[in-house]
């Protein structure tokens, strides 16, 4: 998840800025190659509707677009071929190796997929990540912090249902890295996830 230094993901709801991200996000070639490597290692991607609709149709088309740099064409191939689960109450169809999970039992279906998965599952979408965290289904957080302070906006997590979480939620740092563009990456394990 791309976040500002003050842990906002958007200045205003829906302020995604397209595939390049909003103007405060610094995604250069080095960072994009990092995204590619991490996405390539995923056995599955779980995406909310908003994220899925930002990705499709750009990334499938990017695979063969010679006007784009190779790292973008590479991500297009990764995104298009990796198995995906689209979590949506409104979508009835999805292409590019995606199936749809939705409705009142979506979290239970995702829990079953997690138990059966052979490898890491990436999650895209703040609302979805919040719901999975509250349901104790996220075992790691991967944050790319961009050197910008937004001052206000949509926070990293929507209001968390107190649920079954023993607050405060404790995290353990697993990995961190700094990039030349000023972005830092922190990967945390979520303590106590079953």
Regions found by a protein language model. Give the residues of each.
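Enzymes that bind and transform nitrogen-containing heteroaromatic metabolites
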Residues: 1-194
